[in-house]
Amino acid sequence: MHFTIQREALLKPLQLVAGVVERRQTLPVLSNVLLVVQGQQLSLTGTDLEVELVGRVQLEEPAEPGEITVPARKLMDICKSLPNDALIDIKVDEQKLLVKAGRSRFTLSTLPANDFPTVEEGPGSLTCNLEQSKLRRLIERTSFAMAQQDVRYYLNGMLLEVSRNTLRAVSTDGHRLALCSMSAPIEQEDRHQVIVPRKGILELARLLTDPEGMVSIVLGQHHIRATTGEFTFTSKLVDGKFPDYERVLPKGGDKLVVGDRQALREAFSRTAILSNEKYRGIRLQLAAGQLKIQANNPEQEEAEEEISVDYEGSSLEIGFNVSYLLDVLGVMTTEQVRLILSDSNSSALLQEAGNDDSSYVVMPMRL
C-alpha cells in the first residue's frame, strides 16, 4: 500500500472516524483505524463494535492498493501537527506504516486488516432520504434529554419513530422529555420505532454538516445506517422498550404562560447562581402578568428575579430543576415561549410560541 494525500483531505475524515474509536479498549485492534486503498479511493474505518464509521476520500495521484490498521489517535495527532499545506506520503513497509511529509518522518505500528471487526448488517426494512440540516435540527433539539449511564439502558439513547410522512425523535432521562417531529418522505403505514444508542446519535449529528446535502437512512432489524456523500455510519440499535411518551405529555393544563425566551433564559441563569449546587432547585411564583423566580442554597444565600409575562390565571407556586429549564430554552429559537402548567405537582409542558413541532416536558421538584 502506498499513496500520497494533502493534509486537509486526510484530516477531516480521520477526525470524524477517530471520534468513534474509544481510548480504552479490550481489543488492541479497536484502537486502530482501518485504511484501505482501492483504485484511487482511500477509505478509513473506525469502530467500537457498536458504532462504525467509514470515511471515503478520492486520491489525486495513482496509488498502490492495500489495507492495514494503525493507531487512530496517533495518526490523527501526526496529521494535526503537520503544516496546513503538507503533502503526506504514506506506505506500508514490513508491517510498519511509514508517514513522510516534508522533512518529517514517522513509523507507526500496525495490525493486520483481517483482525479488524465489521459491524454485522442485516437487510434494511425501511429507507428514506432526508435533508441533513433537518435531521441535525431534529437531533439537536432532543439529544440533551437523553440519559447517561442509566440502569434503564433503553433511556441511554434516542427513540426514532417513523410513520407516514413523519420522522419523530424522543428522548428522556426520567426527569424531562424532549420530542421533535419533521416531515419526511416515508411511505410507511404503521408506526415503526427504533432506539439508537447515545453515542450513535452524537456521532451521527457530527456527520450532518452540509446545509445543502442529503442523507440516506436505512433502518434494519438490529441496525441503523446513514450515508452521506463521503461517509457511511452504522450503529447497532438498543434492544429494549422505550416508555410510552404520549402518556407522559401533560394533557389539560389550564395555566398558559407566554414569555420572552431570552429574558426568561437570562433570569433563570442569574437565579441559578445561588441555587443548591447539587439539586439546582428554583421556585416559580406565578401571578397575573408576572413571574417571580427565587432560589436559595444551604448557605442561606438568596436570589430573586421578577419578569413580566403574559398570564391571566390564578396564582401558582412550583419548583423546578433550573438546569432542565435552561436546556430547553437553549435549543428553542423563537422569541416567545409557552409554558403550560396545571398545578404544583404536575409536569410542565414547554413549547415555542407559534411552532408545534417540538414539545418539552419537565417534572416539578418539591422544594
From Swiss-Prot:
One matching Pfam family: DNA_pol3_beta
Q: Where in the cell is it found?
A: Cytoplasm
* Source organism superkingdom: Bacteria
Q: What InterPro entries does the record point to?
A: DNA_clamp_sf (IPR046938), DNA_polIII_beta (IPR001001), DNA_polIII_beta_C (IPR022635), DNA_polIII_beta_cen (IPR022637), DNA_polIII_beta_N (IPR022634)
Kinase is among the record's keywords: no
| Keyword flag Transferase | yes
Q: Fetch the SMART domains from UniProt.
A: POL3Bc
UniProt GO MF annotations: 3'-5' exonuclease activity; DNA binding; DNA-directed DNA polymerase activity
Example GO biological process term? DNA strand elongation involved in DNA replication
Question: One Gene Ontology cellular component annotation?
Answer: cytoplasm
The record's listing under SUPFAM superfamilies reads: DNA clamp
Keyword terms: Cytoplasm, DNA replication, DNA-binding, DNA-directed DNA polymerase, Nucleotidyltransferase, Transferase
What role does it play? Confers DNA tethering and processivity to DNA polymerases and other proteins. Acts as a clamp, forming a ring around DNA (a reaction catalyzed by the clamp-loading complex) which diffuses in an ATP-independent manner freely and bidirectionally along dsDNA. Initially characterized for its ability to contact the catalytic subunit of DNA polymerase III (Pol III), a complex, multichain enzyme responsible for most of the replicative synthesis in bacteria; Pol III exhibits 3'-5' exonuclease proofreading activity.
The family database entries (PANTHER family) matched by this protein are listed as: BETA SLIDING CLAMP (PTHR30478:SF0), DNA POLYMERASE III SUBUNIT BETA (PTHR30478)
Assembly notes: Forms a ring-shaped head-to-tail homodimer around DNA which binds and tethers DNA polymerases and other proteins to the DNA. The DNA replisome complex has a single clamp-loading complex (3 tau and 1 each of delta, delta', psi and chi subunits) which binds 3 Pol III cores (1 core on the leading strand and 2 on the lagging strand) each with a beta sliding clamp dimer. Additional proteins in the replisome are other copies of gamma, psi and chi, Ssb, DNA helicase and RNA primase.
Q: Which family does it belong to?
A: Belongs to the beta sliding clamp family.
Against NCBIfam families, the record matches this protein to: dnan (TIGR00663)
> What protein name applies here?
Beta sliding clamp
* Lineage of producing organism: Bacteria, Pseudomonadati, Pseudomonadota, Gammaproteobacteria, Pseudomonadales
Q: Which gene encodes it?
A: dnaN
